């Protein structure tokens, strides 16, 4: 949506739109996780709350985006796989997935980690990082989305989010995005 279209939305409308975007990111995360393992993944914090964007989101922030008028989502999971060593070969299953999807992707060495990342072409990025200790992580990150007031949207979400999440789960398990009608915590 354009900045002008978002300007016409109420906070409740933006909240519902953020929920749809959150669900899109969670579906992408689950699909990408399954390329590696249907087993148990460790959570790296909660996923529900939108984050102030501007230049913090993946991709290129739209002109005029600030931390006060844009937000993004990110979700990450960690897995330790038998035989994984942080070698380039550990990137191959995810790189194949990216190639099969036709997504623009690239790889890099980040400290001691190797990473491959892809732009889905519809506002999302997927990252897959492998480490020498055999631990690997997957991340899903949105590009910046417009909002009328980042703080108000974050507060509206946070006040309705019970902030509970599992320590670990299989792909497809996610925190439900709160409903506007959920009780507001103070």
Place the predicted regions along the sequence by residue.
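Terminal, regulation- and interaction-focused segments at domain boundaries
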Residues: 2-20, 61-93
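Amphipathic alpha-helical segments
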Residues: 28-35, 85-105
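Surface-exposed patches in mature extracellular/periplasmic domains of secreted proteins
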Residues: 40-45, 103-111
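Short, Lys/Arg-enriched charge-dense amphipathic segments
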Residues: 57-75, 126-141
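Early exported N-terminus immediately downstream of N-terminal targeting peptides
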Residues: 15, 19-71
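An acidic-aromatic pocket/loop used at catalytic or ligand-binding sites
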Residues: 1-36, 106-186
């Amino acid at each position: 949506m354009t900045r002008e279209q978002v300007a016409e939305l109420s906070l409740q409308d933006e909240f519902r739109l953020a929920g749809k975007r959150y669900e899109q990111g969670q579906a992408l995360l689950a699909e990408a996780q399954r390329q590696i393992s249907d087993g148990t993944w460790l959570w790296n914090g909660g996923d529900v709350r939108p984050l102030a964007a501007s230049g913090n989101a993946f991709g290129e922030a739209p002109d005029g985006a600030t931390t006060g008028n844009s937000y993004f989502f990110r979700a990450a999971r960690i897995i330790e796989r038998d035989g994984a060593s942080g070698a380039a070969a550990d990137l191959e299953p995810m790189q194949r997935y990216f190639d099969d999807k036709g997504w623009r992707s690239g790889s890099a060495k980040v400290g001691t980690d190797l990473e491959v990342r892809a732009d889905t072409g519809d506002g999302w990025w997927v990252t897959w990082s492998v480490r020498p200790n055999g631990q690997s992580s997957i991340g899903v990150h949105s590009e910046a989305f417009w909002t009328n007031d980042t703080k108000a949207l974050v507060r509206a979400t946070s006040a309705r989010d019970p902030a509970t999440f599992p320590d670990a789960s299989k792909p497809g398990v996610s925190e439900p995005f709160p409903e506007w009608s959920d009780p507001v915590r103070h």
